[in-house]
């Protein structure tokens, strides 16, 4: 599983930064959070693949977070995508996409399903779930939390051999949590598996001011990607525009007992993120500043 940053600039692109777009790739599936203008260019550079199982989660309907969906859909069609795609977002997301497809008069080579956020839990399958929390921004906006479900413990090869279990399909069944029968004896998964491994938690703030609700929402995340548009010197500007400073992001992470903080969404006024990193590290020990095409392996 890995995080891939496709765009890390706020409001407008720079020579080195595209607009907001973050991907979480796991087991051949891509979960994309926001898609600012030209997201398809960074996506192409990432090598993530055009026909993978995919879901797009939009935090809010400001152009630097959603306009890139249109180009992404068109490019995927030109690449002959056939896999269906789901899109989740705030009220208005369906009208936004449908109107643009109609006006631009382009067809898609694959089906899309658009979901308007109405509940806290918006997606769940046997391996993970996605929850939302209202962010504090200038328009309706949501933060997202990816929660991986606990995984089976590590498979003990030596124990399996001692029990006379032939390698292959029966090993796979045990690893998937199923009982098997060997020589008329029932063997339970716990006989060959270690303790269950806790799943990972990854938070994506989108554009927001810091709030106590978000601190609770992101509690004990393994990684938290948080709005860091400004430095402390522009704290008033952050408040006026409903964004956060790097130091405020670090404070949220510290209070939420987050293991690793990733700063992103930097204002184009800054040439680099040296000061963002310095200010955040005054509060939290483990801080990364995101760059376009940065990949973070999550183990």
From Swiss-Prot:
Entry cofactors: Zn(2+)
Gene Ontology MF terms: 3'-tRNA processing endoribonuclease activity; zinc ion binding
Recorded catalytic activity of this chain's protein: Endonucleolytic cleavage of RNA, removing extra 3' nucleotides from tRNA precursor, generating 3' termini of tRNAs. A 3'-hydroxy group is left at the tRNA terminus and a 5'-phosphoryl group is left at the trailer molecule
This protein's UniProt keywords: Endonuclease, Hydrolase, Metal-binding, Nuclease, tRNA processing, Zinc
Active site (catalytic residues): 64
E.C. no: 3.1.26.11
The keyword Transport appears for this protein: no
Pfam families on file: Lactamase_B, Lactamase_B_2
Cofactor: how and how many bound: Binds 2 Zn(2+) ions.
Top EC category: hydrolase
Binding site for Zn(2+) 2: 64-65, 207, 265
Sites where the protein binds Zn(2+) 1: 60, 62, 137, 207
InterPro entries in the record: Metallo-B-lactamas, RibonucZ/Hydroxyglut_hydro, RNase_Z/BN
Family: Belongs to the RNase Z family.
Primary role: Zinc phosphodiesterase, which displays some tRNA 3'-processing endonuclease activity. Probably involved in tRNA maturation, by removing a 3'-trailer from precursor tRNA.
Assembly and oligomerization: Homodimer.
NCBIfam families per record: PRK00055.1-3, RNase_Z
Protein's UniProt name: Ribonuclease Z
Native species: Nitrosopumilus maritimus (strain SCM1)
């Amino acid at each position: 599983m890995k995080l891939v940053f496709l765009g890390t600039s706020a409001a407008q692109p720079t020579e080195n930064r595209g607009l907001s777009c973050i991907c979480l790739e796991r087991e051949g599936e891509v979960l994309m959070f926001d898609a600012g203008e030209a997201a398809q260019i960074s996506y192409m550079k990432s090598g993530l693949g055009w026909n993978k199982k995919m879901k797009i989660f939009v935090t809010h309907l400001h152009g630097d977070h959603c306009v890139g969906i249109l180009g992404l859909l068109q490019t995927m069609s030109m690449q002959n995508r056939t896999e269906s795609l789901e899109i989740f977002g705030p009220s208005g997301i369906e009208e936004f996409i449908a109107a643009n497809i109609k006006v631009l008069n382009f067809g898609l080579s694959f089906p899309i399903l658009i979901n308007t956020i109405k509940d806290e839990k918006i997606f769940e399958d046997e391996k993970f779930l996605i929850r939302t929390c209202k962010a504090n921004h200038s328009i309706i906006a949501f933060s997202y939390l990816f929660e991986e479900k606990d995984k089976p413990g590590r498979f003990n090869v030596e124990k399996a051999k001692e029990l006379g279990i032939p390698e292959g399909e029966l090993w796979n069944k045990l690893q998937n949590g199923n009982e098997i029968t060997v020589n008329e004896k029932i063997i339970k998964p716990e006989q060959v598996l270690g303790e269950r491994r806790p799943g990972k938690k990854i938070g994506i703030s989108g554009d927001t001011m810091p709030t106590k609700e978000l601190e609770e929402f992101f509690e004990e995340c393994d990684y938290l990607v948080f709005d860091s548009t400004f430095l402390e010197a522009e704290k008033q500007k952050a408040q006026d525009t409903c964004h956060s400073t790097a130091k405020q992001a670090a404070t949220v992470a510290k209070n939420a007992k987050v293991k690793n903080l990733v700063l992103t969404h930097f204002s184009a006024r800054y040439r680099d993120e040296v000061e963002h990193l310095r200010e955040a590290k005054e509060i939290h020990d483990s801080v990364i500043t995101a760059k376009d095409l940065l990949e973070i392996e999550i183990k």
